[in-house]
Structures are given as C-alpha cells and as structure tokens.
Amino acid sequence: MKLHEMKPVEGARKERNRVGRGMASGNGKTSGRGHKGQKARSGGGVRLGFEGGQLPLFRRLPKRGFTNINRKDYAIVNLDQLNRFEDGTEITPASLIETGVVSNEKSGIKVLGNGELSKKLTVKAHKFSASAKEAIEGKGGTTEVI
C-alpha cells in the first residue's frame, strides 16, 4: 500500500447534510425546524436560564457570600521545590522568581511543608506554615518573615 492509495475507512467521513435544497433531499421546505413557532424563526430560541416564564433557578436561590476586596493571594512554594537551590543559599522572593519556582509574587510568598527538604537554607518569605518552619529549622536553616 502506498500513501496515494490510502482511503479513509468506510463511514469515517460523513457528508455534510445540506438543508433547504428541495423536497427530494428529505430536508427541504422547513429544513428540519418543524412548523412555525419561535424555534422555527431565525434567531429563535430562549435566552440562557429562561424557564418558560417560571421564576428561574438563579433568582429563586438566595444570594450568598461576598468578595473580600482586601483578600491576599499568596504564591505557594513547597519544601521540595527549595531543593533546587545550593546548600547554604539565602532564598528571597526575587530568587524564587528568577529561578522560575513562582511566576510572580502576587501578595507575597507562602512556604508550605509539602515534600522533604534535604538542604540547610535561609528562607525569606512573607508567610510560613508551622510544618514548613519546623522542617527548615530542623535541617539547621533559618526562616525570616519579611
């Protein structure tokens, strides 16, 4: 078999159904839209969430919660991500961005205790979880809140 002899499997390529092209096509006249009514018209159809005049679900349910405008969104760094640095390195938010551990600082850097730390490091960040602080100081490193 050669490349120019290859054909798609029977039934793999279905022909497009052209509607409104005469009664003999099987899809003439109303073009599969039925007779009259809103759905038969161009642009016909109900808007998203419309339930036929019944009070829609999104209006039946009460409003809930709010968006805190003072919310702080921290960039997360896990302990196992700190292993890429050399032993005894001072890690700052700038060095984390430079090495690609985090893409941007957001409201600050928070170090979490997921994974294992195998090096003695000095870590400067905006927040530390208790387990992260314990692990860093357990390896002889230091943590500094900035």
Swiss-Prot record:
Q: What is this protein called?
A: Large ribosomal subunit protein uL15
**Summary of the function given for this chain in its UniProt record:** Binds to the 23S rRNA.
Q: Which family does it belong to?
A: Belongs to the universal ribosomal protein uL15 family.
Q: HAMAP family, from UniProt?
A: Ribosomal_uL15 (MF_01341)
Q: Which InterPro entries match?
A: Ribosomal_uL15 (IPR030878), Ribosomal_uL15/eL18 (IPR021131), Ribosomal_uL15/eL18_sf (IPR036227), Ribosomal_uL15_bac-type (IPR005749), Ribosomal_uL15_CS (IPR001196)
Which superkingdom, per the lineage? Bacteria
User: What GO cellular component is one of the record's annotations?
Assistant: cytosolic large ribosomal subunit
| The keyword Phosphoprotein is annotated on this UniProt entry | no
Q: Which gene encodes it?
A: rplO
